[in-house]
Amino acid sequence: MKTLLLSLLITFGLVFQAQAQEALSVTPEETWKMTQEQGDEILFIDVRDPVEIMFIGFTDAVDANIPFKLVDRARFSEEKAKFAMDTNPDFVADVDKALEAKGLDRDALIITMCRSGSSRGKPSAEYLLERGFTNVKYIDHGFQGSSAKEGRLKGLRAVNGWQNSGLPWSMDINPDKIYRP
């Protein structure tokens, strides 16, 4: 009986831990509303590499650009036809600094945004949760959104995401918010 009870407690603990570490998504519109209504109480970060922002666009609604992954231009994969991307070793420390600058702590709501939401948005949110931050979400479909499956825009990132939701963005980058190592 003790073994069964112990097994159940361990299983429940592992399930609870797994659930606690899965970041939840929010829409661009929900994020915009939160930044307007409670902007002093949340930290909204763009986790894209700054060069990517330079070519795709930026929203000044974010508090800061803190890349989760940084492009390593010295390592190129011929097979994938892409440069390597490594986790920014200063990511957590930079998020802590951004929270401190707003007078917030690790219990404050943090929202991350990447290009599509899945490759760095959700992983960066989960990375923060695994490191002691308690309330982290990511923007579903990110800044640029998903590719259209059909029609004249087929293959272009013209569906959902911050850019396609009618929210403010620009090709201009706020120099006070862009990441500089």
Label each residue range with its predicted role.
Residues 18-40, 54-109, 119-181:
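Rhodanese-like catalytic fold shared by cysteine-dependent sulfurtransferases
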Residues 113:
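Short, surface-exposed ligand- or partner-binding patches at beta-edge/loop junctions that are enriched
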Residues 43-48, 66:
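Short hydrophobic beta-strand that contains or immediately precedes a catalytic carboxylate
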Residues 1-5:
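Positively charged n-region of N-terminal signal peptides that target proteins for export
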Residues 51:
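Glycine-rich nucleotide phosphate-binding loop and flanking beta-alpha elements
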Residues 7-15:
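Bacterial N-terminal signal peptides
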